[in-house]
Amino acid sequence: MVKMINLLVVENNNSNWDKIFSFVFDIFLFIFDVIWNTKLPMTNTSIAYFLVFFMVIKLSIYAIHGTSTQYNNLGSTVNNGVSQVYSSTVRKGINVGKNVYQNSNKQQVKKELKRQSIRYQAKNIRSTKFKGDKK
């Protein structure tokens, strides 16, 4: 039964701690399964408490010994994925924004140059008119 359970479980971490505690937990599950089926003098609630207790122990062991490898791998894959997405989308968006800003600056500069040239022409026209009036 233990081998069958181990065959069904997909193991991400093949460390010795994981194998030892998986084996111990499977043995406890087998013992409680026998107690449950043979109706030995334990109440159902006490069996449920023991099951919950050992499940908490198992999960805490995974949290302690599994974080160093599994979550680091997860974090590296998430960072790689995020950096790839960032480089493929956000940087393009930033460049588009810069181009739009540069284009708007160019347009503003062109408009300002036109205004200045119009002012300069108007000044020249006024000065020639006034010079002509004085003559």
Swiss-Prot record:
Keyword Transmembrane helix in annotation: yes
Main localization category: host cell
Signal sequence, renumbered to the chain: none
Cell location: Host membrane
Regions that span the bilayer: 20-40, 47-67
Disulfide bridge map: none
Topology within the bilayer: Multi-pass membrane protein
GO cellular component: host cell membrane; membrane
This protein's UniProt keywords: Host membrane, Membrane, Transmembrane, Transmembrane helix
Family: Belongs to the plectrovirus ORF5 family.
Designated name of the protein: Uncharacterized protein ORF5
